[in-house]
């Protein structure tokens, strides 16, 4: 695998804030970690939590993109607001792309992050190829129902043991390629700004900003 493209734009916040100044956006997730990260990346944009009475569709599509679009459409339909939805996960080359869109429930429907990570670690324990990638699909539906979809990707390898206390999901074992060949820190060992500069979710947010700017 090749590393992700170098990061040329540090943050999309100012552009996105100007574009969305007249409308708030609800984030179609119940995952507090995702909501927090999107708020850290898209500073200056008013991102609202999903109302408690809004039901999201099951994430049972075959691709990250389909899941993200389904959630953004549902949140927009229920609230009438612009909506942003993220669907993301990890793909392992040696496992044919698994866990993929099932990343959040890889070890079972109610599995914890630790259980999911431990299962992946056990499946790669005897594999020579430990290359993995984080993939994020970010869907945006504006207040008029117009849709945009972007994806971000970050290549890396899976460490043999978890390290670090930051992040969530598979971060404690994900060693990103973009920090350099002599840096073996996991995503969970990076500070938030370092992580967002190279992460799949950060890249997707920057691409969304560029797409929206180009359409105006």
Name each region found by the language model.
Residues 12-26, 33-216:
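Anionic-ligand binding patches
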């Amino acid at each position: 695998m090749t590393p992700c493209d170098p990061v040329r734009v540090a943050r999309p916040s100012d552009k996105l804030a100007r574009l969305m100044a007249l409308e708030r956006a609800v984030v179609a997730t119940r995952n507090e970690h995702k909501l927090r990260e999107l708020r850290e990346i898209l500073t200056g944009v008013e991102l609202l939590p999903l109302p408690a009475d809004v039901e999201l569709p099951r994430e049972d599509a075959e691709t990250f993109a389909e899941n993200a679009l389904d959630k953004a459409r549902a949140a927009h339909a229920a609230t009438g607001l612009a909506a942003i939805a993220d669907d993301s996960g990890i793909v392992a080359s040696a496992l044919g792309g698994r866990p993929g869109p099932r990343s959040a429930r890889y070890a079972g429907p109610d599995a914890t992050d630790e259980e999911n990570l431990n299962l992946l670690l056990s499946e790669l324990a005897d594999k020579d190829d430990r290359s993995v990638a984080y993939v994020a699909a970010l869907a945006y539906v504006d207040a008029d129902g117009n849709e945009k979809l972007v994806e971000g990707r970050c290549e890396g390898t899976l460490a043999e043991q978890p390290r670090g206390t930051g992040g969530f999901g598979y971060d404690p074992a994900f060693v990103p390629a973009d920090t350099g060949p002599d840096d073996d820190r996991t995503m969970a060992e990076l500070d938030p700004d370092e992580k967002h500069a190279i992460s799949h979710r950060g890249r997707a947010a920057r691409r969304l900003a560029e797409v929206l700017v180009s359409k105006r």
